[in-house]
């Protein structure tokens, strides 16, 4: 049958290989790259220092507001798993309130019980100094999201803090909680670029469920199957000689 002839499978294998070969190379090369650096280095975690712990003596000395006062002020429902955390933010003790269902976190001054607003650019840079081994040079508040950005998946606004080293390093700081949201370096950007090639999502860089990836995955399977069938047919032909 001509449709199932060796010539047909040879041509099918050749054309399928031509179509998917570049993407197969991208999958292999990016997979090799992903296996080399430690993922913690990609995320910049090696630059983080230990988070300062709450000093009990400091709490007693500064006479902080009782947690029951914050519970009443923020109208917290403990039965709904809403929480109050005592933390440091830019050198000050704060209460961080997390409501349920998830809303924007609320911050209260632990000394006065008053609600607090965003940290300043100077405070954002001081947090980078305190929480990392990096030296900040500038801080800018980001309010607008951008498809495929370095800070995608994180709530805005964020402070974008530029540091001296590593070169082109950026630290993103949450202006509400004062926490380090992300650290981005050239290594992370290389990883992110190759990740977009790997999953074939060149804009958002996070979506596995898109037609292009499915198409080339299916073509890759067909290429392998056609090669196996071609090998099988070739073996039968040679054995018949």
Would you name each region that the model predicts?
Residues 1-241:
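Conserved histidines in hydrophobic membrane contexts and catalytic metal-binding motifs
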């Amino acid at each position: 049958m001509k449709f199932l002839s060796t010539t047909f499978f040879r041509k099918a294998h050749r054309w399928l290989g031509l179509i998917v070969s570049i993407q197969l190379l991208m999958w292999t090369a990016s997979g090799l790259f992903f296996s080399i650096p430690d993922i913690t280095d990609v995320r910049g975690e090696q630059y983080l220092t230990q988070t300062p712990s709450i000093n009990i003596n400091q709490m007693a000395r500064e006479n902080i507001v009782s947690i029951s006062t914050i519970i009443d002020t923020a109208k917290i429902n403990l039965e709904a798993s809403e929480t109050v955390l005592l933390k440091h933010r830019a050198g000050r003790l704060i209460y961080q309130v997390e409501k349920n269902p998830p809303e924007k976190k609320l911050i209260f001054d632990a000394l006065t019980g008053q609600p607090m607003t965003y940290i300043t650019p100077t405070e954002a840079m001081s947090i980078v100094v305190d929480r990392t081994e990096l030296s900040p040079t500038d801080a800018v508040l980001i309010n607008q999201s951008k498809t495929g950005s370095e800070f995608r998946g994180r709530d805005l606004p964020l402070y974008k803090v530029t540091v001296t080293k590593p070169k082109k390093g950026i630290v993103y700081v949450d202006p509400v909680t004062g926490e380090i949201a992300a650290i981005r370096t050239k290594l992370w950007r290389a990883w992110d670029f190759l990740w977009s090639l790997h999953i074939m999502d060149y804009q958002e860089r996070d979506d596995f469920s898109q037609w292009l990836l499915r198409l080339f995955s299916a073509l890759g399977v067909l290429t392998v199957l056609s090669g196996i069938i071609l090998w099988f047919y070739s073996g039968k032909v040679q054995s018949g000689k």
